[in-house]
Amino acid sequence: MKQPFCTPTQALRRVLDAAAALPVPATERVPLDDACGRIAARDLCARMDQPPFDRSPLDGYALHSADTAGAGEETPVTLPVVMKLYAGDAPAAALPAGCAARIMTGAPLPPGADCVLMQELTDSGEEQVRIYAQLQPNANVVFRGEDIAAGAPIAAAGTVLTPAHIGVLAGQGIPDAEVFRPLTVGVLATGSELLEAGKAWAPGKIYDANGIQNAARLRQLGFAVERTHCSDDPEEIAARMKDLLTRCDAVITSGGVSVGQKDYLPTVLEMLHAEPVFAGVAQKPGSPMIAAQVGEKLVFCLSGNPFAAAATLEQYAVPALLRAAGRREEDCIPVHTRGRLTTGFSKPSKGTRFLRARALGGLVEIPGEGNAEAHSSGSLSAMMGCNCLVELPAGSGPVAPGEEVEVLNFVQ
């Protein structure tokens, strides 16, 4: 499994390429009520013009604009009201010249009418109406297809469907959408020291936080998750991974990837005849991470240090899994922006370093008020409230408040 450490850019490219080469996920058709957050499996286009007819955007009177010539507060034009139209009505006849139609918001314009006058510029008459303003053709008309025309794209295949997509689809009379079935990810935490939350604590033991945190993040992104843990035994780890790979589309492990006497994951991957994608990334934290492929399934082996696991999950595992799940590549990658620090970081960075941070409105806060100890890869609590990583290039010195930095925003 040994390979030279790759750069973060190389590591991301390799896992995305590996994910894109996997078989396309199965699809299913779901009602729109259940489609939000799912990934469109094919291009979705408008079936009809929206709105499907010329309509009024306000309460007032539909008119022939020519009939309003010369109308003003001192020189009103009086017209007979020959019909009344509400939203949901279909005009029974065309509007004759020299007549008005009482019309409500959302109602279709009768044939012949070419403008709508708001009722505030009239006397609101029922049988006849006094017009106090002159209108141009097409005034206050929402035209057929103005929102979206028949055949126009709504969502490309690979798009995560949002409430706005759902609303537009429903407005087309489309009751459901073809989406990719969610991938199932096996999450395996390794370590003889681990206890499941709720068990009685014992000296030398710690509760498994990595496994459940990784699982929670994956569920947040729409994956189904099967979670378990096992002791530091290569045979047991291999058996658990084999079992997960029979039922899951990918596996993520935490712990056991470094060079300690009980870091067995490299050996286990060899036992499983895994093909390496990369083994090690030139960054801190998370440098020992391994990405591999067993058959047509991806395996990501993360550090057991909580922040290292969380950072590399976001940087490499999440983008690759989203790509494998059917998302468009551009929607799988953490978005890079620039931000100005409100707090600093007091330590130089010999190699590429990533810090947990919170970005809002172009400002970036690094937790711990510049205290490097708060950014230990073993610290879990400092992740709370963070929504991004700050990248400090190799050879960087300490950074101070007010400096501009590169920000990797977590994928949503």
Regions of interest found by a model, annotated:
Residues 1-73, 327-354:
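Short, low-complexity N-terminal leaders and the immediately following helix N-cap/first helix
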Residues 27-32, 53-79, 112-127, 327, ...:
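Short beta-strand/loop turn elements enriched in aromatics
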Residues 2-3, 8, 62-228, 373-374, ...:
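Short, glycine/charged-enriched hinge/interface segments at domain edges or termini
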Residues 1-9, 175-302, 306-312:
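Helix-rich terminal scaffold detector
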Residues 15, 60, 151, 187, ...:
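Residue-level signal for inorganic ion chemistry
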Residues 35-49, 90-102, 149, 291-292, ...:
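Short, hydrophobic/aliphatic alpha-helical segments
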Residues 9, 28-33, 42, 88, ...:
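Flexible glycine/proline-rich
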